[in-house]
């Protein structure tokens, strides 16, 4: 069964990429703190605006230009911190987590489909390896780059070889399925 390695790889790869979910949850704690801080300082600015920036709402004293600029700076920094925290989560979510889960499931489906396709073994092996290597050189390298912060992985990802392999695998699977899809598992002969 040529597709077996894709099914096994798919489930193991899914464990790795799905495990990024709890990592992102841990980063949401930082997001919660940053969002709370932003709420406080922006709320203070809203109070100042309601008073037309003339007096401090807590002390009712006249507001100096320095106090107003400090309040603005604190609000800007708090919003920047919140955006940076969100960017860390999105950096993982939009890359290795989403693509990894998708490519893991794609390998599982391809592995099962290969069991039902009567075609030359070399072509089935080619399709199988295109999906495995495509997943490793796309989502796998995104994982290394974004989770372990290895910059060399980004250089390899940017070549686009991983997605190209997956697209070629999809094309090959489509052609093989047109000609050889059976309603029951097939036996492969070398």
Which residues fall in each region the model found?
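Divalent metal-coordination and catalytic microenvironments
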Residues: 97-98
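Polytopic transmembrane helical bundles with strong interfacial aromatic enrichment
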Residues: 2-90, 94, 108-148, 157-190
